[in-house]
UniProtKB/Swiss-Prot annotation:
GO terms for biological process: translation. This is Small ribosomal subunit protein uS11. It comes from Sodalis glossinidius (strain morsitans). InterPro entries: Ribosomal_uS11, Ribosomal_uS11_bac-type, Ribosomal_uS11_CS, Ribosomal_uS11_sf. GO terms for molecular function: rRNA binding; structural constituent of ribosome.
Length: 129
């Protein structure tokens, strides 16, 4: 006797109107995470995960593609307004914010939370090319 297949109930995505876009722009990669106001992650994307490897991963275009992919991932939550929090000195800082704006989000404010040492750790030695 065949058993009837048990259907899992489809999870309903919660509707969130306001979100926070956390952009971590390092010299090697750019990570974009969109959360709700409480900090629960709704979607994320990276430049490396978007198909860029090696030195192309650390370009503004790779950061733009990562932001577009992250925006697509959170469209189903109905986010309209975004607060942007940027951390790090990387090349993808500005292009990520532009891409989120072009994706249809209304950016309410931009905050820079790059950690600045009060003369803490010794920085890496200068490159000699």
């Amino acid at each position: 006797m065949a058993k009837a297949p048990i259907r899992a109930r489809k999870r309903v995505k919660k509707q969130v109107s306001d979100g926070v876009a956390h952009i971590h722009a390092s010299f090697n990669n750019t990570i974009v995470t969109i959360t709700d106001r409480q900090g629960n992650a709704l979607g994320w994307a990276t430049a490396g995960g978007s198909g860029f490897r090696g030195s192309r991963k650390s370009t503004p275009f790779a950061a733009q593609v990562a932001a577009e992919r992250c925006a697509e991932a959170v469209k189903e939550y109905g986010i309209k307004n975004l607060e942007v929090v940027v951390k790090g000195p990387g090349p993808g800082r500005e292009s990520t914010v532009r891409a989120l704006n072009a994706a249809g989000f209304r950016i309410t404010n931009i905050t820079d939370v790059t950690p600045i040492p009060h003369n803490g750790c010794r920085p890496p030695k200068k490159r000699r090319v």
